Design a protein with these regions (language model features):
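A helix-centric hydrophobic-segment signal that preferentially recognizes long
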Residues: 1-184
Length: 184
C-alpha cells in the first residue's frame, strides 16, 4: 500500500513540476513579446520625432495636400491612444500607410528634391524605416514562437487553463508591400 501511495505521490509531483515549468515558459515567452514590441516602439519614437520636422519642412511646398497631414496626425493620435501591445500593432499600420502616401505625394514636388533639410530628413527616415522593419521581424518571430508553443499538445492545456491567448502578428496595411519610390 505504501508503494502505491509513493508512486501516486511521485506522479503528482512530476505533473506539478511539469505544470509549473510549462507555465513559467509561457510567461517568459509572453513577456518576451512585450519586450520585443518595446524595441519596435523605440524605433517608432524615433520616427515620430522625425515626422513633425519632415511635415513642417514640406508643408510650405505642399499647401494643397492638407488631407495627408491630417491623416498623419490622426494616425499618430490613434497610436498614442492604443492601450495594449495588440492594439498598437494594429494602429501602427495606419501610420505606415499615411507616411507612405506622403512620400508618394512628395514626388510631385520637384522643389523638395533640392531642399537639403528635406533630403537629410528623408535619409534619416529611410534609416529609421529599416530599423523598424528589423524590429518588426523580430517581434513577429517571437509572436510566432509563442503562438506555436501554446497550440502544441500538451502545452495547449496549460495555456488554456491559465488564460494564455494567441498574440497578434504585425501586419502591414493593404498595399504596403509595394514600397513607395521617393526620388529627392
Amino acid at each position: 500500500m505504501k508503494k502505491i501511495g509513493l508512486i501516486i505521490l511521485g506522479v503528482i509531483a512530476v505533473l506539478a513540476l511539469w505544470v509549473f515549468s510549462t507555465y513559467n515558459s509561457l510567461v517568459t515567452k509572453n513577456v518576451a513579446i512585450d519586450g520585443q514590441w518595446a524595441q519596435v516602439e523605440t524605433q517608432y519614437q524615433r520616427r515620430f520625432d522625425l515626422i513633425p520636422n519632415l511635415v513642417s519642412s514640406t508643408q510650405g511646398f505642399m499647401k494643397q495636400e492638407k488631407t495627408i497631414f491630417e491623416e498623419i496626425a490622426k494616425a499618430r493620435t490613434q497610436y498614442g491612444g492604443a492601450k495594449t501591445v495588440d492594439e498598437k500593432v494594429q494602429t501602427a499600420g495606419q501610420l505606415d500607410g499615411a507616411l507612405s502616401r506622403l512620400l508618394v505625394i512628395m514626388e510631385n514636388y520637384p522643389d523638395l528634391k533640392s531642399n537639403q533639410t528635406v533630403a537629410q530628413l528623408m535619409d534619416e527616415l529611410a534609416g529609421t524605416e529599416n530599423r523598424i522593419a528589423v524590429e518588426r521581424k523580430r517581434f513577429n518571430d517571437v509572436v510566432g514562437d509563442f503562438n506555436i508553443t501554446i497550440k502544441k499538445v500538451p502545452t495547449n492545456m496549460i495555456a488554456g487553463m491559465f488564460g494564455f491567448k494567441e498574440r497578434v502578428f504585425f501586419k502591414s496595411e493593404e498595399g504596403a508591400q509595394k514600397a513607395p519610390k521617393v526620388e529627392l
